């Protein structure tokens, strides 16, 4: 079937009978990822302004080619690769359909990345300024090749949210070499587990993978990592790793930077002994505020998910950088009180003198520099008014 995304027209597989996503019997196309791709296009446009020398883009798991075609339409010199020859043929057809130049290659992404430079099947000058990893499941099997061979930017999607968030803990430990915990802030847990693993992977190549934009949306995690090949910068970024100590009784949490955990024997708030440790996690900023603002400026009217993309980026830009968020509904359930509107809840925290913002992780999530006890005393129980 033919579709339009952004400014390009594409041929994609028709949906199977009864499917709510455009998934054919062979080549994969997911229309629910249009939001992801809209933000990707805006990020690529913003990055062109940030680093004009970044010209080449690898769509490492191209499938129908939609991501690569949209990147080509934004001015990048695109290479689309996939292990499925039918996918590569469809990607080539979609490039031609839009009168766009680009190369297609039936190959494994790791092989293409490791053969960049003199050994590249694309030519001795081939090197990728931007590498986009959008696999089904975890991106970790492709991370080494990407960080060892990309020049400027690595864009990563992870859809294995259950291991990332701690719901499938052993799988998360095996894949990400981190202990994840399934808490009420599980979307952010997943993002910080992923960033921890990616930053540690890049550091093995004396490279800092700096998050300049990240978001968690619709059962996937997405991050954009700018590369700095100074070993000292990689060391600085590793110092943003650490641990979160979470009380399962009162929901208090505290964090500690460093490579060695020092978990408390009991909760300093309720004195309970059900304190669990998560980590090593990335505890630093998930985005660069100025870059996020520029990405938002490149969300344009032809994008199908313009309203949601702008809303997500606005929240990501403005949310506090504290490492974990709270959920008002979960707190109110714990306190046996009714929830109130989020704007009113945030305003009550501001009135009490605390910093507080809503976050993009959910409609009832917020970040604040107040403790659990301070949040409870600063906000009202509507049943007692």
UniProtKB/Swiss-Prot annotation:
The keyword Lipoprotein is assigned to this record: no
Domain Trm1 methyltransferase: start-end pairs: 1-379
Assigned keywords, A-Z: Metal-binding, Methyltransferase, RNA-binding, S-adenosyl-L-methionine, Transferase, tRNA processing, tRNA-binding, Zinc
Source taxon at top rank: Archaea
One protein family per Pfam: TRM
Gene3D superfamilies per record: N2,N2-dimethylguanosine tRNA methyltransferase, C-terminal domain, Vaccinia Virus protein VP39
Binding residue positions for Zn(2+): 247, 250, 267, 270
UniProt-annotated binding residues for S-adenosyl-L-methionine: 37, 67, 82, 108-109
Annotated InterPro entries: SAM-dependent_MTases_sf, Trm1, TRM1_arc_bac, tRNA_met_Trm1_C
E.C. code: 2.1.1.216
GO biological process terms on file: tRNA N2-guanine methylation
Gene Ontology MF, one: tRNA (guanine(26)-N2)-dimethyltransferase activity
EC class name: transferase
PROSITE patterns reported in the protein's UniProt record: SAM_MT_TRM1
Catalytic reaction list: guanosine(26) in tRNA + 2 S-adenosyl-L-methionine = N(2)-dimethylguanosine(26) in tRNA + 2 S-adenosyl-L-homocysteine + 2 H(+)
Cross-referenced NCBIfam families: PRK04338.1-1 (NF003327), TRM1 (TIGR00308)
Protein function: Dimethylates a single guanine residue at position 26 of a number of tRNAs using S-adenosyl-L-methionine as donor of the methyl groups.
Family note: Belongs to the class I-like SAM-binding methyltransferase superfamily. Trm1 family.
PANTHER family: N 2 ,N 2 -DIMETHYLGUANOSINE TRNA METHYLTRANSFERASE, TRNA (GUANINE(26)-N(2))-DIMETHYLTRANSFERASE
Name listed for the protein in its UniProt record: tRNA (guanine(26)-N(2))-dimethyltransferase
Species per Swiss-Prot/TrEMBL record: Haloquadratum walsbyi (strain DSM 16790 / HBSQ001)
